[in-house]
Every structure is written in structure tokens, then in C-alpha cells.
Amino acid sequence: YRMIVLERRAYDNTKALIDFAQGRSEVDTALGDNASELLRIRKCIEDVASLSQFALDSLVIMASCSPEGAYSLNRRLSADRSEAVRKYLGDFVPEEWKDSLKVSVLPENWEQLEKLVSNDTVMTGDAVRKILDVIRNMKDPDVAERKLAGFPEYRYMREKLYPKLRSVKFDFHLHR
């Protein structure tokens, strides 16, 4: 005979770049590429819902912000955006999933910023090292943001890198 091990728990995730107006949390399907991103997320939800061998334990929705602005305000903004996306998607999930939609917050996505800066091909090596030094030795995110704002590369970072930090992650926790 042959033994097959089936894991009881399963996990899947995806990330969407959902645009929000500055300082706002409303889901606007007409803003940026939101319509196609939200459609992609809805398709992902449909695909997971169609997996008859799995049941959903939770779908955790976590919105993250870029570092500009006070950390405390970004915490509130992240929570408000996560909740707005949860409410929006509530109309598109199976009825039995509605209570399984959870929200989480990531006020400022410094880990992703570190990756983006490390992999950037526009900024010079010296600038990258200085920026990474600020990020990696950060004790207070608001102080770190003020230090970054003093660098000549800050405008580039705000225009090209920071928008990539404003994302929403979807974690599907499932079981057999």
C-alpha cells in the first residue's frame, strides 16, 4: 500500500496595489488601476471559494501605508483602509465567509521599502547605502522618515517607491 500525507491546513496569499486618495480610506474603483486590481482579487476569492476540498478559516486583509506622515496617523489610516476593503469585498464573498473576513494593520511598510531600495537601479550605490543605514538602524519611524526627507533622493523615493508600499495583502487561511 502507499501512504499519502495530506496537510490539514493550507495557506494562500496575494497582494493588490489599491490606490487611495492621500490621507483617505474610501475604496474608489475609478482611481488608478483599482478596478482591475479589485477584479483580480474578486477572481482570486472565487477561485479559493471553488476549492471544495478546503474550508475557509479566515481571510485576513492587511493594508499598509508608506512612511510619510506621523506613524500614529498611518496606523489609523492602515486600519481604516483595511476595514474599507473588508466592507467592499463583503459584497463579493460567499455568505458563509462574511464572518471570516478579518482586518490587520501595517502602519508603515519599512521592510518592503528596504527591499525596494536594495533592488533600485536608479539611485547611486552610496545613496542606497545611506538610505539603508537609516532604515536598518531605525528606532523611531518618524525620526527615520525625517532623516530620509533630508536626502536628495527623497523626492524620487516618494514618487517611485512609496506608491508600491501602499498595498493590501490578502491571507487565506484554510483547512480540509
Question: Where is each model-derived feature located?
Answer:
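N-terminal targeting leaders that direct proteins to extracytoplasmic destinations
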Residues: 1-8, 164-171, 175-176
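Residue-identity detector for threonine
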Residues: 14, 29, 121-124
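Extracytoplasmic
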Residues: 13-15, 54-56, 98, 165-167
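Periplasmic peptidoglycan-binding/anchoring modules of Gram-negative envelope and division proteins
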Residues: 2-11, 20, 25-67, 87-90
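Periplasmic OmpA-like peptidoglycan-binding domain that tethers envelope proteins to the cell wall
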Residues: 66-170
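Residues that form or immediately flank small-molecule/cofactor binding pockets and catalytic motifs
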Residues: 25, 106-108, 175
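Soluble periplasmic/extracytoplasmic beta-strand elements of cell-envelope proteins
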Residues: 17-21, 58-62, 102-104, 167-173
